[in-house]
Amino acid sequence: MRRRSLGLCILLGVGQAFASELRWGFSPADGMPYVDIVDHQLQGGFTRQLGERVAQRLGLSLRFVETPNRRIDGFMASGHIHVICNSNPGWDSKPERYHWSPALFEEQDVLLQRDDRPAIRDFAELRGKTLGTSLGYVYADDLMQAFAAGEIRREDTRDLASRVQMLKRSRLDAAVDMRRPLLYLTRQHPELGLSVSPLVLQSYRMHCIYGGQLPVPVESMDRVLDEMVRDGSIGRLLENSLQAPQEP
């Protein structure tokens, strides 16, 4: 009798797990190849593909929730979202508030330049130049020190599209952003006459963060993500997301 009761409890527990919803946040600031957003809905990109595969492996239903960066803390605390990715503990003033996933992949801060200008290959070449940057972002220590000393001029903008327009008008010498979004941009729009410079300003690892109301144990989420790193799934998703969309 006890064995039957235990079996019934296990079955019920499995059924509840499959019925649970995983609420996956996505930042509109990430852009492609990470997020493809139409009318505030996540239509494609790496983040969507990653969320779908993780939810499938965990046996959870899935809902994507648009989450501006300034809303992450509140959404996590309220359970409005359970997880959001493309983050790094070094960017958070209180990283201990969250559980951080294993590192999923590496990103780099690099420069976008006009093709008709000499490629910037060394940090010293930035002296006296104006760089387009993201409002409120903190960059590598040597770059932040150069900004503070006035050796390099910082021009904050709200998004990459604004920096691209300023580059086209020669109001910037270069724009700073993550490598993959810049590669995606230059591949999709060669007519812009822009390219990614060889100089790497900073390299860092990207993680997911989990809130306290995650519908599965954090160990389960960590295990699935770690398996996807080890079996090459993460790398393949990233590479696929960088490719040009197929014609209908």
Task: Label the model's feature ranges.
Residues 20-90, 95-96, 156, 221, ...:
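Extracytoplasmic small-molecule ligand-binding "clamshell" domains
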Residues 113-131:
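Flexible hinge/capping segments at coil-to-helix
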Residues 61, 138-152, 194, 226-248:
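Ligand-binding clefts/hinges and TM-proximal coupling segments of bilobed small-molecule sensing domains
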Residues 2-7:
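N-terminal export leaders
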Residues 27-30, 106-110, 187-226, 244-248:
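Periplasmic-binding protein-like
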Residues 14-15:
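N-terminal signal peptide c-region/cleavage motif recognized by signal peptidases
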Residues 65, 70-82, 99, 124-125, ...:
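Short helices/loops that flank or line small-molecule/ion binding pockets
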Residues 74, 86-96, 145, 173-202:
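A ligand-binding cleft/hinge motif common to bilobed small-molecule-binding domains
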